[in-house]
Amino acid sequence: MNVEVRNEARLDIAEGVAFYDRQGYGAGDYFYQRIFEDIDSLSETAGIHETHFGYHRKIASRHPFLIYYRIVAAGVEVVAVLDGRSRPEDIDVLLQRR
């Protein structure tokens, strides 16, 4: 299954990279590599995850991030990659705008 990452989700990932870069040398690169491993795995596992706020939600394997996606005719569309420590109300509002 084809996996497409929307621009908004790419910006979310860039924010995560910037956060981890501030934590220590190489941490941002590690985050980037691991989050894309999780996203790439959706080509095989899309649809098995619970839905939250109208989207499927995959929990990232190595960081406290949540990958929100939907299944579309062309495959999988990742709409957001958000810090799982955020308030659920804030996540809901953000996802309604996407």
How does the language model describe each region?
Residues 1-32:
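Arg/Lys-rich, positively charged N-terminal/basic patches that mediate binding to nucleic acids
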Residues 18, 27-30, 50, 54, ...:
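Solvent-exposed interaction patches of small proteins and small membrane subunits
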Residues 36-37, 41-76:
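Basic/aromatic recognition patch in beta-strand/loop cores that engages polyanionic ligands
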Residues 66, 70-98:
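Enriched for short, Lys/Arg-rich terminal
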